[in-house]
Amino acid sequence: MNASRIAAAGASTLTRRIIPCLDVTAGRVVKGVNFVNLTDAGDPVEIARRYNEQGADELTFLDITATSDGRDLILPIIEQVASQVFIPLTVGGGVRQVSDVQRLLNAGADKISINSAAVANPELVRAAADYHGSQCIVVAIDARRSSAEGEPARWEVFTHGGRKATGLDAVAWARRMAAYGAGEILLTSMDRDGTKSGFDLELTRAVSDAVPVPVIASGGVGNLQHLADGVTTGRASAVLAASIFHFGQHTVRECKQYMAERGIAVRLT
């Protein structure tokens, strides 16, 4: 991590972070609803540069079909972005072994997100954290509500871009991954993804309260209040969004100003 990224990461530990998410497939940024019906949103390098200029705290790149398609890592895209963007980059998709973590770090990533491979081989998370440090390792959890109305809330973990049910309880899985060395949990509600109806705040709060590491709330942001709710009601350390940024509804700067006006500590530039 270069000096400017270290400074950005250090400042963000004292504030709530706003993180644009770039879902990538076939070299393009896409956005769907409930993990399907993908719409092209543009070139990843151009979009990353725009969010960097708007004052994003970090960027998250997720190759959403790398694992299901059996493809390699998106190294060329990350190399291009890292040469032009000076905030922390989290990259996920197609990570299968510790050597993949090293390859992405060498390409310019600052943190590596592990999702399907963590379920297939939980020891990968422990090994990667032991070798590279927990601060580099993010475990991504895609969760869908599995409890019926009136029952105690439960959420099931899905892998392979939301295509494969695992039978794992999301809260228990998050707790286990934190114990294995994950430095952050990236928590996406599959039920809310792309719906613009707001985070699943019950899910976000349940996981945030269960783990001793930062939780990044994801899935469902449709307006500025949703971002604030993720922090205040969901108790997330960071909020991640895509649609409201990609299609010009709001800028990162507008989101930060809104949160600051409501007493939420954010990094203003």
UniProtKB/Swiss-Prot annotation:
Known catalysed reaction(s)?
A: 5-[(5-phospho-1-deoxy-D-ribulos-1-ylimino)methylamino]-1-(5-phospho-beta-D-ribosyl)imidazole-4-carboxamide + L-glutamine = D-erythro-1-(imidazol-4-yl)glycerol 3-phosphate + 5-amino-1-(5-phospho-beta-D-ribosyl)imidazole-4-carboxamide + L-glutamate + H(+)
CDD domains linked: HisF
Q: Name one GO molecular function term.
A: imidazoleglycerol-phosphate synthase activity
For this protein, what is the EC number? Answer: 4.3.2.10
Q: Where in the cell is it found?
A: Cytoplasm
Q: Which Pfam families match?
A: His_biosynth (PF00977)
Residue positions of the active site: D23, D142
Subcellular location, principal? cytoplasm
Which domain of life does the UniProt lineage start with?
A: Bacteria
Task: State the pathway, as annotated in the record.
Answer: Amino-acid biosynthesis; L-histidine biosynthesis; L-histidine from 5-phospho-alpha-D-ribose 1-diphosphate: step 5/9
The job of this chain, per UniProt, is described as: IGPS catalyzes the conversion of PRFAR and glutamine to IGP, AICAR and glutamate. The HisF subunit catalyzes the cyclization activity that produces IGP and AICAR from PRFAR using the ammonia provided by the HisH subunit.
What protein name does the entry list? Imidazole glycerol phosphate synthase subunit HisF
The record's gene field reads hisF
